[in-house]
Amino acid sequence: MGGKDIDRLIEERRKQQNIEEILPELQLEERLIYANRTARVTKGGRRFSFSTLVVVGDRKGHVGFGHGKAKEVTLAIAKGIEKAKKNVIRVPIVDGTVPHDVIGTFGATKIIVLPARRGTGVVAGGAAKPVFELAGYTDVLTKIIGSTNPDNVVRAVFDALLQLKTPEQIAEERGLPVEEILRRYRRYALPKMNIKHYYPWRGIYEQT
């Protein structure tokens, strides 16, 4: 799974969601994850450039990320922001958290994402936290396994977000009313989520 093309998956999701139509209306915040300076040796000496990773989001269910590269750091950041806007997708939020547990992977990085009760906060480290915050999640539990490289982490988070299903989608799959899905979610999922002793809880939607 580590070789998946996250950029292609994002592009497909954007088309499904018609993001381009609403993008100009979104009030997007920006967060710089990193700005690295690199040097290239040429006959004329060393030439420096900057590479950046930026996350944008409206804290209302829309989030994206992008990379920028330029000779000036400000221009590299601007390019990162522009690319991040072109990668914005809509993600489902239920009671401030994710609608179900999910595992995202990219390269040598795996991230476990679990729903959390109100008041828990965004329990995420490194590059993962700003993605969840700018997406609009206020309570979520996460655990990163493997590489903590910011690029891998961000892409692993987006892999997880792309797998999330809305309560409406789950209800349709289960043949149940949305209200019943939410009832089971609040009764069985939230009280039992534990990042230290995690195992998949999607079976909660089959409980009565």
Swiss-Prot record:
Keywords: Ribonucleoprotein, Ribosomal protein, RNA-binding, rRNA-binding. The keyword Membrane does not apply. Signal peptide: none annotated. It comes from the Bacteria. Coiled coil: none annotated. InterPro entries: Ribosomal_Su5_D2-typ_SF, Ribosomal_uS5, Ribosomal_uS5_bac-type, Ribosomal_uS5_C, Ribosomal_uS5_N, Ribosomal_uS5_N_CS, Ribsml_uS5_D2-typ_fold_subgr. One of its GO terms (cellular component) is cytosolic small ribosomal subunit. Residues 28-91 form the S5 DRBM domain. SUPFAM superfamilies: dsRNA-binding domain-like, Ribosomal protein S5 domain 2-like. GO terms for molecular function: rRNA binding; structural constituent of ribosome. GO terms for biological process: translation. The keyword Mitochondrion does not apply. PANTHER family: MITOCHONDRIAL RIBOSOMAL PROTEIN S5. Belongs to the universal ribosomal protein uS5 family. With S4 and S12 plays an important role in translational accuracy. Located at the back of the 30S subunit body where it stabilizes the conformation of the head with respect to the body. Part of the 30S ribosomal subunit. Contacts proteins S4 and S8. The N-terminal domain interacts with the head of the 30S subunit; the C-terminal domain interacts with the body and contacts protein S4. The interaction surface between S4 and S5 is involved in control of translational fidelity. HAMAP family: Ribosomal_uS5_B. This is Small ribosomal subunit protein uS5. It comes from Aquifex aeolicus (strain VF5).
